[in-house]
Amino acid sequence: MPSHQHQNQQQCTPQAQQQQVKQPCQPPPTKCQEACVPKTKDPCVPQAKKQCPARSTTNPAQEKCPAQQDPKCKQK
């Protein structure tokens, strides 16, 4: 009889923990990654959304000048 109770508890622990960790862990990272947070420490922050598009436009615009497009821009 005691062996029967042990088998019932083992099958209920792994299945209940796996379903509870997979449900709340998959939606947040998947929804946050689609917003635009590849180089941010916080995958779910209101500031991360603003830094993604703002940094993306300032990075290529500022790097385009002294990068290798206009040698006159580097001297100025």
UniProtKB/Swiss-Prot annotation:
Function: Cross-linked envelope protein of keratinocytes. Involved in UV-induced cornification.
Keywords for the protein's UniProt record, in alphabetical order: Cytoplasm, Keratinization
Highest rank taxon of the organism: Eukaryota
GO biological process, one term: keratinization
One cellular component term from this protein's GO annotations in UniProt: cell cortex
UniProt name for this protein: Small proline-rich protein 4
Family: Belongs to the cornifin (SPRR) family.
Location of this chain's protein in the cell: Cytoplasm; Cytoplasm, Cell cortex
Main subcellular location of this protein, as a coarse class: cytoplasm
Gene from which this protein is expressed: Sprr4
Disordered: annotated segments: 38-76
Organism: Mus musculus
Modification after translation, per record: Cross-linked to membrane proteins by transglutaminase.
